[in-house]
């Protein structure tokens, strides 16, 4: 969170909070969903599920996930910020949305639901709070914490999902063999609320909800009634038997004719009789008076406008199902608005990585001139690989402009004349392709990449570094041979002169060692390296001689001192006696030498 500035709290739920934040570098406003730190595994399971689905499925009417990171054992999901929902619209329009706005919203919501269902995904929590509305009027389905893949025959689901007011009767009765129709039921309840401004089945308990379903929608099917009678929760409860009109427009008199037909097709007690999302997009409510042909160009223009502002790239493939988020702040998904141009960013990372690999190669290399051709060869190979990498990168689906054919017929993908091969599970809606590993930033960040990209300046620098290191090695070997020569003390004067000569040699060696160019001085910072190396390699008397040399070099600060120390002590006393005979007669002759 260091890169974000918190602006306030957007919402709070049982699993976490949503904060409005601003990226400090780019100034972009984002929404960060922070999951609570709880001991139970349900929170991590929900977070993992949401990350998995948002990573795998991309659509213009699904909310975009920017990045994921963990901080202080809390999972953070960073989304594009849209601070407006259908619930906010309903609070503003107390009597429901106007018919034109309602139809545009429902068309986009159905496209998102159809995309999920065609990919065998059940959202399981469709409600006005989970429908985001951008400033340009594009709706985005969000909150995939309860979404899951359609179960195989015989498998069961979790029974407690979805908000109660929009929960299908099979969910209320905890029938674990439910499927896609639960989303259609929730959509029908939400359509009535969006059209009238009031929730259709508000309830305080499961029993209260069942009672209202029987009163307003219809009686339970034999299968559901059997589950109800065997449930210990509803033991002793008897539901009323109500006769409902079969005509949808009489059953829902507050809705216009075609919209009442849609709601009646959605709110069927038997899940098998509920209409599918694809059939809903074919309904006369959307196909009459050329609505799709008129709305598609408008939607296309809005998507292009938002694509310029929110040009998302494909996420990195570094998320694992067993390990939801790594304990680091590396984003799972990156946004070029937050981290710069993805192509340039990838090239910079790749160049730095290759430079480090080249440095390791130079350090391990032995010899001088023989290695230079290999480096040049590696350089040429790196350039060819970089060109190949640049040719292999592909733009993301939002970076390119969507063609008219993609938006002309979102219901029938086979009718599109575009040559691009579409996902067979796309269901005909304008979709973004599943995430793959063709993005340039993925290639740049791939740790298994072994490409080397040395440039000419780096090659010259390695040559200089090799020459300097060889010079230092020769200097050290010469000084070691000179310093470790045999020394024999014949007289005090001769021994000191020999030590003085060795000091001069060491000083000259240090001078030669430090006599580099300014560029080389930046590369090497070890003025005491000769003594360290000698101390490790020399043994016995050689180490002692070095210590004696250091001690004597500290004592001899000026060239005048050796002449004083080389004088004989008896001669010194005689000269003092000749100059001060009286002082020496008083017993001060034995002064310390």
From Swiss-Prot:
Domain Protein kinase, residue spans: 4-286
Keyword annotations from UniProtKB, A to Z: ATP-binding, Cytoplasm, Kinase, Nucleotide-binding, Nucleus, Phosphoprotein, Serine/threonine-protein kinase, Transferase
Bias-annotated ranges (Basic and acidic residues): 368-403
Chain intervals for the UniProt region annotation (Disordered): 368-512
E.C. number(s) listed in UniProt: 2.7.11.22
Tissue: Highly expressed in brain, and to a lower extent in heart and testis.
Residues that bear Phosphotyrosine: 160
Active-site residues from the entry: 125 (proton acceptor)
Reactions the enzyme catalyzes: L-seryl-[protein] + ATP = O-phospho-L-seryl-[protein] + ADP + H(+); L-threonyl-[protein] + ATP = O-phospho-L-threonyl-[protein] + ADP + H(+)
Pfam short name (any one): Pkinase
TM stretches of this protein: none
Gene Ontology cellular-component annotations: cytoplasm; nucleus
Enzyme class, UniProt record, top EC level: transferase
Residues with the Phosphothreonine modification: 158
Biased composition range(s): Polar residues: 468-491, 499-508
PANTHER family xref list: CELL DIVISION PROTEIN KINASE (PTHR24056), CYCLIN-DEPENDENT KINASE-LIKE 3 (PTHR24056:SF177)
Similarity-based family: Belongs to the protein kinase superfamily. CMGC Ser/Thr protein kinase family. CDC2/CDKX subfamily.
Descriptive protein name: Cyclin-dependent kinase-like 3
Organism: Rattus norvegicus
Protein's gene: Cdkl3
């Amino acid at each position: 969170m260091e890169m974000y500035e918190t602006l306030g709290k957007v919402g709070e739920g049982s699993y976490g909070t949503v904060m409005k934040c601003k990226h400090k570098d780019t100034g972009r406003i984002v929404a960060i969903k922070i999951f609570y730190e709880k001991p139970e595994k349900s929170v991590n399971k929900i977070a993992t599920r949401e990350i998995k689905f948002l990573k795998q499925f991309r659509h213009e009417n699904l909310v975009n996930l920017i990045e994921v990171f963990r901080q202080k054992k809390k999972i953070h999901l960073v989304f594009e910020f849209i601070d407006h929902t259908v619930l906010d619209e309903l609070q503003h329009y107390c009597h429901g949305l106007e018919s034109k706005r309602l139809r545009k919203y429902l068309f986009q919501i159905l496209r998102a639901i159809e995309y999920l269902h065609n990919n065998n995904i059940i959202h399981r929590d469709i409600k006005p709070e989970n429908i985001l509305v951008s400033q340009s009027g594009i709706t985005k389905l969000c909150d995939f914490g309860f979404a899951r893949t359609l179960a195989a025959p015989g498998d069961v689901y979790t029974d407690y999902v979805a908000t109660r007011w929009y929960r299908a009767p099979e969910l209320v009765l905890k029938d674990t063999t439910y499927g896609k129709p639960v989303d259609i039921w929730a959509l029908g309840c939400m359509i009535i609320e969006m059209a009238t401004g009031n929730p259709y089945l508000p309830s305080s308990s499961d029993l209260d909800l069942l009672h209202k379903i029987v009163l307003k929608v219809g009686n339970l099917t034999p299968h559901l009634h059997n589950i109800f009678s065997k449930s210990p929760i509803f033991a002793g409860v008897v539901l009323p038997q109500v006769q409902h009109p079969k005509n949808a427009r009489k059953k829902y008199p507050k809705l216009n004719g075609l919209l009442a037909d849609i709601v009646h097709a959605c709110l069927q007690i038997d899940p098998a009789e509920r209409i599918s999302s694809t059939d809903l997009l074919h309904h006369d409510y959307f196909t009459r008076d050329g609505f799709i042909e008129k709305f598609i160009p408008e939607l296309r223009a809005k998507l292009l406008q938002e694509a310029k502002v929110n040009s998302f790239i494909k996420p990195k493939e570094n998320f694992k199902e067993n390990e939801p988020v790594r304990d680091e702040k590396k984003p799972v998904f990156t946004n070029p608005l937050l981290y710069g141009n993805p192509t340039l960013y990838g090239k910079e990372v790749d160049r730095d990585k290759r430079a480090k690999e080249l440095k390791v190669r130079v350090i391990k290399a032995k010899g001088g001139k023989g290695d230079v051709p290999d480096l040049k060869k590696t350089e040429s190979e790196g350039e060819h690989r970089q060109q190949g990498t640049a040719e292999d990168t592909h733009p993301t689906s939002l970076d390119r402009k969507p063609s008219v054919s993609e938006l002309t017929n979102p219901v029938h993908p086979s009718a599109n004349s575009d040559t691009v091969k579409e996902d067979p599970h796309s269901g005909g809606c304008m979709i973004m392709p599943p995430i793959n590993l063709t993005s340039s930033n993925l290639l740049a960040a791939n740790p298994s990449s072994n490409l080397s990209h040395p440039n000419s300046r780096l090659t010259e620098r390695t040559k200089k570094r090799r020459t300097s290191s060889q010079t230092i090695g020769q200097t050290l070997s010469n000084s070691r041979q000179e310093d470790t020569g045999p020394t024999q003390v014949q007289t005090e004067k001769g021994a000191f002169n020999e030590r003085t000569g060795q000091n001069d040699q060491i000083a000259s060696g240090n001078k030669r060692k430090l006599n580099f160019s300014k560029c080389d001085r930046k590369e090497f910072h070890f003025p005491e390296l000769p003594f360290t190396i000698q101390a490790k390699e020399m043994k016995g008397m050689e180490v002692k001689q070095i210590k004696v040399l250091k001690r004597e070099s500290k004592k001899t600060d000026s060239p005048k001192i050796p002449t004083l120390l080389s004088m004989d002590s008896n001669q010194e006393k005689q000269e003092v006696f000749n100059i001060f005979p009286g002082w020496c007669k008083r017993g001060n002759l034995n002064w310390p030498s």
